[in-house]
Amino acid sequence: CYNFQDFRSLAKSKLPSPIFNYIDGAADDEVTYRRNTSSFDDVSLVPSVLRGVKDVDISTTIFGKKLEMPVYCSPTAVQRLFHYEGERAVAKAADKFGTMFGVSSLGTVSVEEVSKISSSPKMFQFYFHKDRGLNNSMLERAKAAKFDVLALTVDTITGGNRERDLR
């Protein structure tokens, strides 16, 4: 793959259509999806020319942790729908490239297992549930697994109105 569209086409050819549409789709009329995607067309990557490239350093620091590159692997629910290793694969990739990744509280691999796979900085994305015991258990497990950051998701854990799926 040479660009985003190549990667998207490859995914569409390899994944069952319900899985592809889950990843590729969005809620309602997909207006925000189209805006987010088209925003990449508004960015120009302008190279610095006639400059040395011997010591290029794209590392950054976030939450007091050094990342080798300013790319973050965002948490996504039920990752094993998309790849047989799910969060394991993301943890390995983040570790290999020295960047941060997140694990959803709706993940398919335990926080304990993910923590053993990667020494990279990790974020636990937490959905608040009605069951306080479940909440406490998830938070304690993430803390014990040495997750660096907690992200509280405040929208909802119910699915959106995904019109593409209804069609």
Spans of model-derived segments:
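Hydrophobic faces of well-ordered beta-strands that scaffold small-molecule active sites
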Residues: 71-74, 99-103, 122-126, 150
